[in-house]
Each structure stands twice: as structure tokens, then as C-alpha cells.
Amino acid sequence: MGLPRLVCAFLLAACCCCPRVAGVPGEAEQPAPELVEVEVGSTALLKCGLSQSQGNLSHVDWFSVHKEKRTLIFRVRQGQGQSEPGEYEQRLSLQDRGATLALTQVTPQDERIFLCQGKRPRSQEYRIQLRVYKAPEEPNIQVNPLGIPVNSKEPEEVATCVGRNGYPIPQVIWYKNGRPLKEEKNRVHIQSSQTVESSGLYTLQSILKAQLVKEDKDAQFYCELNYRLPSGNHMKESREVTVPVFYPTEKVWLEVEPVGMLKEGDRVEIRCLADGNPPPHFSISKQNPSTREAEEETTNDNGVLVLEPARKEHSGRYECQGLDLDTMISLLSEPQELLVNYVSDVRVSPAAPERQEGSSLTLTCEAESSQDLEFQWLREETGQVLERGPVLQLHDLKREAGGGYRCVASVPSIPGLNRTQLVNVAIFGPPWMAFKERKVWVKENMVLNLSCEASGHPRPTISWNVNGTASEQDQDPQRVLSTLNVLVTPELLETGVECTASNDLGKNTSILFLELVNLTTLTPDSNTTTGLSTSTASPHTRANSTSTERKLPEPESRGVVIVAVIVCILVLAVLGAVLYFLYKKGKLPCRRSGKQEITLPPSRKSELVVEVKSDKLPEEMGLLQGSSGDKRAPGDQGEKYIDLRH
């Protein structure tokens, strides 16, 4: 019973297969279509693969095949093409003498099979598969701004990657620190989705979820889009991002800025740090040196204690405390010693030394510091280094030794850490004037501003011999400057002005001569002052007598001097005229050469030369030259030479 059934089944199968084996037309297996690849927006060239004989291409129909449905889109008759109404009506044209159909402005919807069918001499068809591609835009990555706690039980969202307007759908790969991530149960999960835009392009969105640890706080994540174009495979990478990772604090410590040795006056920051994220609430305390208990210091919101300017009192032991507000666990840092280096106030002894001329003086400088000190003594007026060390010895004191001396105490190992102290040395003596005499050029009825300076110890006082508005100003403890405003009158021009400086040891006087400025006044020399005030001479140019007073010369004596000068000039002029007259008459035994030969034996001509020098002053010679018009050579100083001969 079973055998007949088996035979019947075999015969039925043979009958069903016989027609295909016999080669019934239209039922043979079709070859694979030709592949044509283009990018969106470009032109696709669909070349009909039928026989190239004119007969085969003169009568061709083009179809688009979508979901196994053929739609006629183009006809070719006798080499002329005609589009059929529909979506391709405006985008098709013939090329290559009718062998190629051009499709412009390709879209993703054009990805399908196109078929060309020839009718003569017999029916043939050729299939073309059109593939369309579009590169996606640069991937956009967004990190999870809320961060990820390390104690999470499930993978948390790390970042989202979006690739827009690609075709077909690109492939996304996630990377961490340059290494690709793969799906891992309870550790890594990648969730992707795509959206079809109205243009037919795809937008891909991929979400990376992972469980992170503390070491991932600096990890770099990025995504990569892989896609294909007619030219081959390509890829685009996003920027790298770091996701906030939250982990508990395990350690708290202190940092001090600047690093290195600190000194008074610096800006010092004591910063509290922790290895947790987010950081705990910080507080900084300093140990009280008396009670040895920690006392909390005032810090800013970031747990930073600012010492500005730092002082010696800021030295001590500091600690930082961190309180985790989530777990309420408190951690304490290791104590750290802070040393603010200092130099105490400098003390000089004696503080106000007074000495007699010719005596000696020893100045001693003292100071304390947290480091080794170096001392040096400087002259205040010049800055000259007088001594390196705490002791300065001054011997055989002169008046010039009075004034300021500065002691500098410094720490060589810490640049800029130093203190100084100035001491003024007073040398007993009567007043010392800045100048003895001075000429001042003035105009009548003008107000003069005269000045007079004197120094000495005890401090001198200055008085004037004329009425006016006077004021004094201390230049230093032993030097005083007095100024006087006075109206120029004829009486003042006659008497001049005196300023007198006096102290317990004597007095001294400076004289100011007043001269009217007019058309006949000669230009003042370099030692006179044309302004209304006098200048102060340096101590090295002062000429002072300390126990005598110098009075202004009487008007009569000044007139006698002027008359004597005029008489001398007249006598010199007469003498010059007489000499010139005798010279022109030949009465003088000399020529222009200034030499006269005296006869001597030839053997002795070179033995005797008499030099005769003129006893006339240079001024007289100048008068003679001016009257005769005879200009002397620059080297001729009026000397005459006479050769003696037999």
C-alpha cells in the first residue's frame, strides 16, 4: 500500500517539473541586474544592455519596478524618446544615440530596478539596479549634564550621538579612550533609533549607557558614523567629551601657594582639596599656640584661606576638614606647618648720636629674624655702602660726616625680605652757610623771593637784616632753609641783604648783592643769579668762617674802587699810544719779526741767544693790537728774540 503511494508522488513531481525542463518561454531563471551607484542629487546613467544593433534600440520601452510592479516611464520609437506622465516625466532624457537613459536629480525614492525592453526582432529585456547614497552630516554628540554616580546599579546614560540626513542608514560605533565599545550585559548598552525625513533621508540617534567607575572621571568618549558612497566606505567622528562622574571622597589635604619660602607681605593662599566629586564642605582651622586647640579660620566659598599681607603671626599648624553632605562622613587632613619668614624692626644704638668734631662714633645695628641675617651700613645721601656688618666705626669726625646713616638687615636666602633704620648723626658746630656771597640781578619795585640755607648742630635759626615775609623749612635735623619775600627799593639796592644763621656755638652770615638789570648792565657771569632766588651750593663748595661777621662795604669805598679802575684804563691807553707812535717812527730797536741780529764771529753765532720778554700785560697787548690793527698769531704772546753778533 505504501509503495504505490510513493510511486504516484514521484510521478506527480516529475510532471510538474517537465515544462521548465522543456524550456517553456518566459519561465527561465533571470540573470542578476546590473548595479548602478549614484549620490543623491546627481544624474544616473541607465545604459540598456541589449544588442547594440539599430534594430534592437529603435523600439524600446523603459519600466520602473517597485514592489514587483512594472510602470512604463519612457518610450523609444525610431530613435526618439518620449516620457510617460508621472514622477519621472521631467527628469528623463536619451543619451548615447538612444542607448542610455539619463535620470537627473536622483532622490532616495529612486532606489529601485529599472528595466529596458526591446520589441524587435524579438522581445528582450535588461534589468538595472539603481543604488542611491548620501553622506550624513557631522555627528553631534551631547554628554549627560547630570553626571553618573559610580554606585549606580544599572548602566546610566553617558552621551547621545545624532547623525542627520544620511542614506542609507549609517552604522554607529562608540569609543572610550580610543577603544570601541561593545554590548556587555549590565555594563554597556547601546540603544539606536532612526527617523525617515520627508526627503527620504535618515536621521540616526544612538544612546550610550554604561556603568562607570572613579577612573572614568577623565575618560574621553566619542561616536563614529560609518557609511558608503559610490567611491567606497567612509566614516565621520564626533568631538570627544568627558562625562561628570560622581564618587565619594577618600582623602583630604592642604596646599599652600606660592610654593617655597614665604615672607611677610606676600599674598598666601591655603587651599583645602579632596579626591571626591563633588568635593565635600571644607573648613580650615589653625592651632592656638597657647591652648593647642584648633580654631576655625574664615574661608571663602571654595575653602580657600587668603592671608594678605602675610604676617609673622600667621605662622603655625593648619588642618583641613571635609564633610560629605550626602553621607555625613567627615575627613581630616594631615596637619601642615606654615612658616612666614620675617625680619623684626631694626634697632640702632645710639638712636640720636651727637659728637664733637675730631671725635669717634660707633653705631650698632640689631634685629631678629626667622633666618640668618646680613647687615650693611649705607650713607643716606649717596647710597654708598660703608660697612658690611652690624657695627659701623666712624673716626676723626668732620662736619661733613653729619647727616643720615641707614642700617639694612636682610635675609640673603629670601630676596626682598629686609628691614631698614635711619639714624642722623649730629656734629656740634656753629652754623655753616651754603654760600658766603652772591649777586642777584633784580628790577626795581619787584618782589624778590630770596633763600638762604644753613646747617649746624644745634639746629641754627636764620634772621634777615631787612623787613619782609620770612619762613623756615627743615631740610633735615641739622639743616634749615629760610625764604624771604621783599620789595626791591632804592635803599635795598644800596645796602643789599644779609641772612644770619646762629646757634649756641656761634653765627655766620651770607651776603646777597642786588644789581639792577638795565641796557648797560653786562651779562652776569656764571657765578651770579639772574632770577629772584638763590641756589644752594653743595657742602663741598662751601666757604665759611665761623666766628666773624662780614659787613657790606660802604658806598664810598665802592666809588673809590670804580674811579681807580677807570684811571688805570686811561693810563694803559696813553702808554699804548706812545709805544705805537715810537714804533711807527722807528725809534724802537725791533722789527715785525721781533728779532735783531748782533754781529758775532761765525763760530759763536749759535752760542748766544738773548730772550727778551715784554712786561706788558695781555690786556695791554690787546690794546696795542686794537689800535694798530696788527693781528698777532695765536702763538705769539708778545715775546721777542734777539740774536747777538759781533
Swiss-Prot record:
Plays a role in cell adhesion, and in cohesion of the endothelial monolayer at intercellular junctions in vascular tissue. Its expression may allow melanoma cells to interact with cellular elements of the vascular system, thereby enhancing hematogeneous tumor spread. Could be an adhesion molecule active in neural crest cells during embryonic development. Acts as a surface receptor that triggers tyrosine phosphorylation of FYN and PTK2/FAK1, and a transient increase in the intracellular calcium concentration. The lineage of its organism: Eukaryota, Metazoa, Chordata, Craniata, Vertebrata. Residues 244-330, 335-424, 430-510 form the Ig-like C2-type domain. It is found in: Membrane. Disulfide bonds join C48-C116, C161-C223, C272-C320, C365-C407, C452-C499. Keywords: Cell adhesion, Disulfide bond, Glycoprotein, Immunoglobulin domain, Membrane, Phosphoprotein, Repeat, Signal, Transmembrane, Transmembrane helix. Residues 584-646 are cytoplasmic. Residues 278-299, 525-554, 620-646 are annotated as: Disordered. This is Cell surface glycoprotein MUC18. It comes from the Eukaryota. Glycans are attached at N56, N418, N449, N467, N508, N518, N527, N544. It comes from Homo sapiens (Human). Detected in endothelial cells in vascular tissue throughout the body. May appear at the surface of neural crest cells during their embryonic migration. Appears to be limited to vascular smooth muscle in normal adult tissues. Associated with tumor progression and the development of metastasis in human malignant melanoma. Expressed most strongly on metastatic lesions and advanced primary tumors and is only rarely detected in benign melanocytic nevi and thin primary melanomas with a low probability of metastasis. SUPFAM superfamilies: Immunoglobulin.
